[in-house]
Swiss-Prot record:
It comes from Solidesulfovibrio magneticus (strain ATCC 700980 / DSM 13731 / RS-1). This is ATP synthase subunit alpha. Belongs to the ATPase alpha/beta chains family. GO terms for cellular component: plasma membrane; proton-transporting ATP synthase complex. It is a peripheral membrane protein. It comes from the Bacteria.
């Protein structure tokens, strides 16, 4: 094959005609110093707060400090290959993450990159992670229930859609277990769940993912993971990334639930970054704006007005206390931001009362409006009864003679404590809870031995599912107990008791 000279000249002419000169302009700077995942950069005069800068090797950095002659940047990756004098490029992009249905069922990092080996996240839309919380007019008061599937929570500290309920307690008291149960309880409820793991061990996150997958909950759940080995900047930003992804559903008229596990570790990573950026330390060496760190995050959980689609975002932040010290800086901050707290106690946990909820210290400030009437009817006095039982139990230790009424209160209290115990990963729907609590509070279990209460409850639930499913359905539909239904319930429980052997 021979190429003729005129053909060559033709090709050259075509190339000249289609030639486009491209000049890319980007503002660059120079690394002044780098270390501990913090870089000082000179020369990027127009950089914005929360903007991403590109370092050599594709490592991204987040602009946090804007000073007169340089900017303080938190690196979102390894700093080992970055050195003084390296060029830094502005991207002009504010920190944003992919949102939408594409992230559902995935395990991703705070930047939106998949870490579950299931291929790339094909999201059609991205959103900035720092978004202003909805105002007062945009909101509606909390009025729909968000069931956790736990009798102790749904009966005494009910949670509503759009609420922020703090889960607080020492390490190893079952805080994560309560939240995982809450995710499992959303099956078939049309709620999109988000679990943000901040500073956890990788093995713990893998275990959570496996548990959710095993119970079929990953279909509607997203896990955002910034483990203990990640840079502090990613641990700090992970909560906002998760919140932005959950807000997408809230803004589209759906219901979402987000769990921050846990905000103590987020505050620690923020303190680390602030001190390295030379911001002045305050109480417990936390920076002055650590309250704002959590308030701007948790204020984004809301029940939106009908005009905005009536979507909701419910937040369950977790705080780990040290030796039960609820009056430390971060716990008091988050308690004052949230709409109530569920307090878990190691003593109760070790005594076999699980979930280890201290009923006296746990409150729900707005959830009462969201509780269904049937639950109010059966559990209305439960909190007070348990408080009286605990007081009487303390006196009864002295072995003084007790009158009949006191003995009845003590024996019923013991049975109610036993009844409120629940195995892990076994959430109950509202009708099942109403039946169990009805049997307990109306005295049907007073003659059942304490050690047989759990067996009685299991048998009762099985009996209702097999023989009296019409009553279960009626409770689900009516969401209230009328006289006819109360009579039916009583008769059915009596019938079951005749055949029950402890």
């Amino acid at each position: 094959m021979q190429i003729k000279a005129e053909e060559i000249s033709q090709i050259i002419e075509q190339q000249i005609q289609h030639y486009e000169s491209r000049v890319e302009m980007s503002e660059t700077g120079t690394v002044l110093s780098v270390g501990d995942q913090i870089a000082r950069v000179y020369g990027v005069q127009n950089a914005m707060a929360m903007e991403l800068l590109e370092f050599p090797g594709g490592v991204m950095g987040l602009v946090l400090n804007l000073e007169e002659d340089n900017v303080g940047v938190a690196l979102l990756g390894e700093d080992t290959h970055i050195k003084e004098g390296d060029p830094v490029k502005r991207t002009g992009k504010i920190f944003s993450v992919p949102v939408g249905d594409a992230v559902t069922g995935r395990v991703i990092d705070p930047l939106g990159n998949p870490i579950d080996g299931l291929g790339p996240v094909e999201a059609k839309e991205t959103r900035n992670v720092e978004i202003k919380a909805p105002g007062i007019i945009a909101r509606k008061s909390v009025h729909e229930p968000m069931y956790t599937g736990l009798k102790a929570v749904d009966a005494m500290t009910p949670i509503g859609r759009g609420q922020r309920e703090l889960i607080i307690g020492d390490r190893q008291t079952g805080k994560t277990a309560v939240c995982i149960d809450a995710i499992l309880a959303q099956k078939g409820q049309g709620v999109f769940c988000f679990y943000v793991a901040i500073g956890q061990k990788k093995s713990t996150v893998a275990l959570v993912a496996e548990t959710l997958r095993r119970h079929g909950a990953m279909e509607y759940t997203t896990i955002i993971s910034a483990t203990a080995s990640e840079p502090a900047s990613l641990q700090f930003m992970s909560a906002y990334s998760g919140c932005t992804m959950a807000e997408y559903h809230r803004d589209n008229g759906r219901a979402a639930l987000i769990i921050y596990d846990d905000l103590s570790k987020q505050a620690v990573s923020y303190r680390q970054m602030s001190l390295l950026l030379r911001r002045p330390p305050g109480r417990e060496a936390y920076p002055g704006d650590v309250f704002y760190l959590h308030s701007r995050l948790l204020e984004r959980a809301a029940k939106l007005s009908d005009a905005l689609g009536a979507g909701s975002l419910t937040a369950l932040p977790i705080i780990e206390t040290q030796a039960g010290d609820v009056s430390a800086y971060i716990p008091t901050n988050v308690i004052s931001i949230t709409d109530g707290q569920v307090y878990l106690e190691p003593n109760l946990f070790n005594a076999g009362i699980r979930p280890a909820i201290n009923v006296g210290l746990s409150v729900s400030r707005v959830g009462g409006a969201a509780q269904v009437k049937a639950m109010k009817q059966v559990a209305g006095t439960l909190r007070l009864d348990l408080a009286q039982y605990r007081e009487l139990a303390a006196f009864a230790q002295f072995g003084s003679d007790l009158d009949k009424a006191t003995q009845l209160k003590l024996s019923r209290g013991m049975r109610m404590v036993e009844l409120l115990k629940q195995p892990q990963y076994k959430p109950m729907n509202v009708a099942e809870q109403v039946i169990s609590l009805f049997a307990g509070t109306r005295g049907f279990m007073d003659d059942v031995p304490v050690e047989a209460v759990r067996k009685f409850e299991e048998g009762l639930q099985e009996y209702f599912h097999n023989a009296k499913s019409d009553i279960l359905n009626e409770i689900q539909e009516k969401k209230a107990l009328d006289e006819g239904l109360i009579a039916k319930l009583g008769a059915a429980i009596d019938e079951f008791k005749k055949g029950f052997k402890a």
